[in-house]
Regions:
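Short helices/loops that flank or line small-molecule/ion binding pockets
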Residues: 44-49, 63-77, 85-90, 180
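Extracellular/periplasmic bilobal clamshell ligand-binding domains
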Residues: 171-197
Length: 197
C-alpha cells in the first residue's frame, strides 16, 4: 500500500506527518474501507510504530475512503497503489511512503516505511490461488502450471506494474511460508486495533 495525503497538505514526507500528529494528537484524520480492512491495518501499524494518535474514519469501501481524502473530509489514506496512482501522477495526491519491502516500480522516489524510519511497518496486499484440500493432485498440478505460465507473461507483468501492483509469484511451499510469515506479522497488529476473536 501507499500512504497518501493531498498535494496541498503541509507534509512533504512521513516524518513531517508523524511530527505534526505528535504535536496534535487526534487532530489529523485518515480514512479506510472499514475496521480491520486493507486500508485500516497499515495505518494502524504506522500510528503504533510512530507513537502517534490519528483519527480513524472508516467508510464502507475503498472508493468512499478515497473520495473522502480527495474531498478534504480526511487528511490521509493508506491505499493500494492502483486506485491512487492517477491522482499522484495528476498532482492531486502526494505519496509519503509505501508499506512493502521494496519501493513500488511506479513510484521510485517514494521511500518504504522502513526507509522512512519505521522498519516494523510492513504490509502487503496480496492475492493467491487456493483449491479445496480434496482437489485431485493432477488437477492441482495443472492449476499450478497455468498460474506459473500466467505469472511469466510479459504483457501481464507490464500491465500490473503500470497499475502499481507488480507481481511477485510464489509457488507451493514458498507461498505457504509467505502466508505463515505474513499472518505472524499481522496478528499482533490486528490485535492492537481492537477485539479479535
Amino acid at each position: 500500500t501507499v500512504l497518501v495525503v493531498p498535494a496541498a497538505s503541509p507534509w512533504r514526507n512521513l516524518g513531517e506527518l508523524a511530527e505534526d500528529a505528535k504535536r496534535r494528537p487526534g487532530a489529523i484524520s485518515y480514512s479506510s474501507a472499514g475496521n480491520f480492512s486493507a486500508l485500516h491495518t497499515p495505518m494502524a501499524m504506522f500510528t503504533a510504530a510512530a507513537g502517534i494518535d490519528m483519527l480513524h474514519v472508516p467508510f464502507q469501501g475503498g472508493g468512499p475512503a478515497l473520495t473522502a481524502l480527495l474531498g478534504g473530509t480526511v487528511q490521509a489514506l493508506a491505499s493500494g497503489t492502483g486506485p491512487v496512482m492517477q491522482h499522484i501522477q495528476a498532482g492531486r495526491l502526494r505519496a509519503l511512503a509505501t508499506t512493502g519491502a521494496t519501493r513500488v516500480p511506479g513510484l521510485p522516489d517514494v521511500p518504504t516505511m522502513a526507509e522512512a524510519g519505521y522498519p516494523d511497518v510492513l504490509y502487503l496486499i496480496w492475492a493467491g490461488l487456493f483449491v479445496p484440500a480434496s482437489t485431485p493432485a493432477g488437477l492441482r498440478e495443472q492449476i499450478r502450471q497455468a498460474a506459473a505460465r500466467a505469472a511469466e507473461d510479459g504483457d501481464a507483468q507490464r500491465a500490473l506494474t503500470t497499475a502499481g501492483s507488480p507481481m511477485a509469484y510464489l509457488d507451493g511451499p514458498a507461498f505457504e511460508a509467505f502466508i505463515r510469515e505474513d499472518a505472524a506479522r499481522l496478528i499482533p497488529a490486528v490485535r492492537r486495533i481492537g477485539r479479535v476473536e
